[in-house]
Amino acid sequence: YLVLATGMWSRQIGEDTGVNIPLYPAEHFYIITEPIKDLPKDLAVLRDFDDSLYLKEDAGKLLVGIFEGKSIPAFSKTNRVPNDFSFGEFPENFDHFEPYLEASFKRVPLLENAGIRKFFSGPESFTPDTNTLLGEVPEVKNFFVCCGFNSIGIGSGGGAGKVTAEWMMNGHIKEDLFIYDIKRF
């Protein structure tokens, strides 16, 4: 058995082994504000699907990120993550991020007056439908994938690992996870 769980490198590793992994690195953007006085440390994570935003408390600051529908492909010249790349950043593209930041002001008005401490633009792996890729690939028996978490890998890893192990051991799973099955493509 083989489990491919290599994040944004999964597609090109799949290509190198004759397996199609529909996952692509795209630019992912977020900002971290300057410290905000009296910001609750137990603030819930806010996900605004209408405006493609997520917001969360980050050590007394707010992190505002986006999962936009029209993302910018990363490494578009080669369509491959460079072999020497190690979670670096891309040049700032505030023009792309600004409309989303402005939309966040209606959700959390105090953001309008908050300073920006950090602007981040870096690669993250995304699938065409933004759902995770799990299961046995159609091209190679006993070759499983567990990737394409679109920035939610840490939170999903335990359950995805459990399901992948069950799939490998039993040849099937109890849950209906077709929306995540790599064979949906």
Q: Where are the regions a protein language model picked out?
A:
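Flavin-dependent oxidoreductases
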Residues: 1-78, 82-91, 99-110
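C-terminal catalytic lobe of FAD-dependent flavoproteins
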Residues: 42, 50, 59, 73, ...
